[in-house]
Amino acid sequence: MGLATFTSCEDESIAYDLEGTWEGRVFDYSEWDGTRYNISYSLLEFYLGAFRLVQGNGHWVDFYDRGPRDYVSYKIHWRVDNQVIYITFNEDGTQYRVTNYHLSDRRFWGTMYEYKNGQPQGYSHDFELRHTSSPNWDNYYSDYDYYWSNYGYGHYWSNEGVFETEDGTATSPAKSYSDTVVKTAPKRHLIEDNK
């Protein structure tokens, strides 16, 4: 007998509304090699996985004021389970759970809690993001590869604004951001109204 899994209609609706790009302030600063750098804003990209109704992958990009880089991008995996949104950073396994939130087609706000190895870290923060773009569904259905390449997966955008591919060729900047390869990622800090 096979195991069947079910997703709630609410979870599917939340995942559908979450898909796209959101901008706003979540983290206050990062520490990199003992130096503190202010984060001016963050950009979060959520994309549903193929044939997955309540989960997917994406990027979380922190933009810096006078930092060692203009921005740092992290790969994330996200899912909705029992109306809780789980965002996990692929690089270090840090997870943020979003609860007590409001999600519309324009705004997303709520409370974010930090977890590491499944254990709460004692940090929480109220945040607010605005919706800035959605996937181009016409391109998604007519040309699957174009959809993914349109968002720059597997590439990075340097500080000089040149978009470099993995084989070293350069093109114009992409519409979206992808991960910069960072040997030591900065430690992220929630804005200082921790509860």
Write out the residue ranges for each language-model feature.
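A structural signal for short, hydrophobic beta-strand segments that form beta-sheets
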Residues: F46-L48, V98-L103, L129
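Generic short beta-strand segments
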Residues: E23-E31, N57-F63, W109-K116
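Edge beta-strand at a domain terminus
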Residues: K75-N82, E114-K195
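N-terminal glycine/threonine-rich, aromatic-flanked beta-hairpin/loop signature
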Residues: R36-V84, A185-K187, I191-E192
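C-terminal motif of bacterial Sec signal peptides marking the signal peptidase cleavage site
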Residues: A4-S8
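N-terminal helix-cap/turn-to-beta initiation motif at the start of protein domains
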Residues: C9-E23
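Acidic, glycine-rich flexible loop segments
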Residues: N82-R107, Y113
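K/E-rich alpha-helical interaction surfaces of small helical-bundle regulatory domains
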Residues: E19-Y29, Y74-K75, R79-N82
